[in-house]
Curated annotation (Swiss-Prot):
Transmembrane segments: none annotated. Residues 1-16 form the signal peptide. Monoheme cytochrome that function as the electron transport subunit of sulfide dehydrogenase. It comes from Chlorobaculum tepidum (strain ATCC 49652 / DSM 12025 / NBRC 103806 / TLS) (Chlorobium tepidum). InterPro entries: Cyt_c-like_dom (IPR009056), Cyt_c-like_dom_sf (IPR036909), Cytochrome_c_Oxidase_Subunit (IPR050597). This is Cytochrome subunit of sulfide dehydrogenase. The keyword Heme applies. GO terms for molecular function: electron transfer activity; heme binding; metal ion binding. The gene is fccA. Keywords: Electron transport, Heme, Iron, Metal-binding, Periplasm, Signal, Transport. Heme c binds at residues 41, 44-45, 83. The keyword Flavoprotein does not apply.
Length: 110
């Protein structure tokens, strides 16, 4: 048994113990989940929802309006070329979070 002791200690399976492992530093999340999800919208609608092209602006629209539009795109009751495909990729909860984020931007900027 004594001959095996150095092997056990070297492998970490011996009697020697150390303190608890240090926890890695965690960077706090500063963005909301809705803000993170909205990043895929920014390419067409702008980072703040205020489009500078022929794509409709969603800045200033209510969360309810945006959520209803996304749900309608998702279920096909509102026709589109691209939005239906995007909306189908989101859960109902994610659609709600995106709508809340964009719908409340104009309130934050005043």
């Amino acid at each position: 048994m004594l001959a095996a002791a150095p092997l056990l200690l070297a492998s970490g399976n011996g009697f020697a113990t150390t303190g608890p492992a240090a926890k890695p530093a965690v960077k706090p999340v500063t963005e909301s989940r809705g803000e993170i999800l909205s990043l895929s919208c920014a390419g067409c609608h702008g980072t703040d929802g205020n489009s500078s092209s022929v794509i409709p602006s969603i800045y200033g629209k209510s969360p309810e309006y945006i959520e209803t539009a996304l749900i309608d795109f998702k279920n096909g009751s509102r026709t589109s070329t691209v939005m239906g495909r995007h909306a189908k990729g989101y859960t109902g909860e994610e659609i709600h979070l995106i709508a809340e984020y964009f719908g409340n931007l104009s309130k934050k900027n005043h």
